[in-house]
């Protein structure tokens, strides 16, 4: 009984001490989550900026080929002097020379070729990376300029080639026909012929560009070559109706019915090799497409210029004699000459396409190309000639030659432009 009462007192004291300790302890703080400070990040581009251009314009791998018909025009061949004149009056002295009142210019300072037909074929490969390889080759048909003039049986009208006569210091003319009985009538004919052929090839890498909606933009870099071949010839034929009216190499012993003539030939060959850069913009819808291309090439033009001339005499019996030198081509300027010049070749093109099927497209477009520093045959003519070096001139051999005509490489520019109609097939 006493032990039970003692244990009850001990338990009561222990509970009282525990309660007091709990009341004196500091209040418990509420739990809280501590967050780490935010890490700064590069802000994203505004949505309106990202919508302007996608950084790359990647397309699936594809191959395409195209073929175009070309309808082009080129810059006519310039000449350093009018080549053929005529006159119907006998009061001018000398007749048919430049600056005389009765002189008519029959072939002026530019020879036109008209419209050229041609072709252009191309091949391209679009890589999955967005790069593309493109190549094309074009060729224009060879076209000619032709001029013919002849007098009647009385030598009317006067037909001539004008030149500046360095022996006497005046504008003069070599007569091909003459109807003046006082100086000797003779008949004659002249022919002027010129020809041109143009072709070229290029290989480009098109870089992966930017896009916006239906538009895509690419850069171009590559290599191109061009070839321009041209010629000019002047041929005369004079018939002596009576003894001694015409001379050959200073001799008037030309019987009636004999034929004398002059031949001048000028040819040029231009080869351009250079690197090029450019850009291309394209627009594509489900049916229509538009491509605009601009590029410029820098490089060297290698030139070969050939000058030759001769005169001939054909006797009534058929015996022939040929001597060097015509009119504008004499031993003083004849020969084969080589030159290399720096050239720039810019080109611009516009093409509109219509999708015929999922793989076939019809195209129509326009191209303009310019080429600086080229040699053209007519520019190589020196219009200053000493009359005493012309084998068919009456004054042949009367004074020592003075080196005229002389050869000087004369540069010109060239352009070609026109329309193209074609088809493009994509594999």
Task: Mark where each language-model region is.
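Bacterial N-terminal signal peptides that target proteins for export
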Residues: 1-7
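Bacterial N-terminal signal peptides
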Residues: 7-16
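Viral structural modules
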Residues: 10, 22-23
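Sec/Tat signal peptide C-region and signal peptidase I cleavage site
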Residues: 17-21
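Outer-membrane beta-barrel transmembrane strands
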Residues: 23-80, 103-151, 171-237, 257-299, ...
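Solvent-exposed loop segments that connect transmembrane elements
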Residues: 83-104, 155-182, 235-265, 306-336, ...
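Short acidic/glycine-rich loop or secondary-structure boundary segments that cap or lie
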Residues: 299-305
């Amino acid at each position: 009984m006493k032990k039970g009462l003692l244990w009850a007192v001990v338990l009561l004291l222990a509970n009282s001490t525990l309660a007091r300790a709990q009341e004196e302890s500091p209040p418990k703080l509420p739990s809280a989550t501590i967050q780490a400070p935010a890490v700064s990040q590069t802000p994203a581009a505004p949505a309106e900026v990202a919508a302007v251009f996608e950084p790359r314009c990647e397309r699936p791998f594809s191959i395409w080929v195209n073929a175009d018909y070309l309808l082009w025009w080129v810059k006519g061949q310039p000449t350093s002097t009018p080549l053929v004149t005529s006159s119907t009056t006998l009061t001018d002295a000398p007749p048919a020379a430049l600056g005389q009142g009765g002189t008519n210019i029959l072939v002026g300072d530019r020879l036109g070729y008209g419209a050229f037909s041609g072709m252009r074929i191309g091949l391209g490969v679009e890589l999955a990376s967005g790069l593309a390889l493109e190549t094309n080759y074009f060729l224009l048909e060879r076209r000619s300029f032709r001029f013919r003039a002849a007098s009647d049986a009385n030598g009317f009208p006067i037909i001539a080639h004008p030149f500046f006569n360095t022996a006497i210091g005046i504008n003069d003319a070599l007569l091909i026909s003459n109807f003046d009985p006082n100086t000797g009538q003779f008949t004659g004919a002249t022919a002027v012929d010129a020809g041109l052929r143009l072709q070229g090839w290029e290989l480009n890498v098109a870089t992966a560009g930017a896009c916006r909606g239906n538009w895509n933009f690419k850069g171009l870099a590559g290599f191109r070559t061009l070839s321009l071949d041209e010629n000019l010839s002047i041929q005369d034929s004079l018939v002596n109706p009576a003894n001694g009216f015409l001379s050959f190499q200073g001799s008037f012993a030309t019987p009636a019915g004999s034929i004398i003539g002059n031949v001048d030939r000028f040819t040029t060959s231009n080869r351009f090799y250079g690197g090029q850069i450019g850009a291309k913009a394209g627009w594509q819808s489900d049916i229509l497409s538009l491509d605009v291309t601009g590029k410029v090439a820098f490089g060297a033009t290698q030139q070969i210029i050939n000058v030759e001339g001769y005169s001939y005499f054909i006797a009534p019996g058929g015996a022939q004699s040929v001597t060097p030198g015509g009119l504008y081509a004499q031993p003083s300027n004849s020969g084969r000459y080589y030159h290399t010049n720096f050239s720039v070749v810019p080109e611009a093109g516009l093409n509109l396409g219509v999708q015929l099927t999922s793989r076939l497209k019809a195209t129509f477009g326009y191209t303009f190309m310019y080429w600086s520093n080229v040699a053209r045959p007519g520019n190589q003519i020196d219009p200053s000639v000493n009359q005493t070096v012309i084998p068919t001139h009456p004054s042949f051999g009367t004074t020592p030659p003075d080196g005229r005509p002389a050869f000087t490489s004369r540069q010109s520019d060239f352009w070609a432009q026109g329309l193209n109609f074609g088809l493009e097939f994509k594999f």
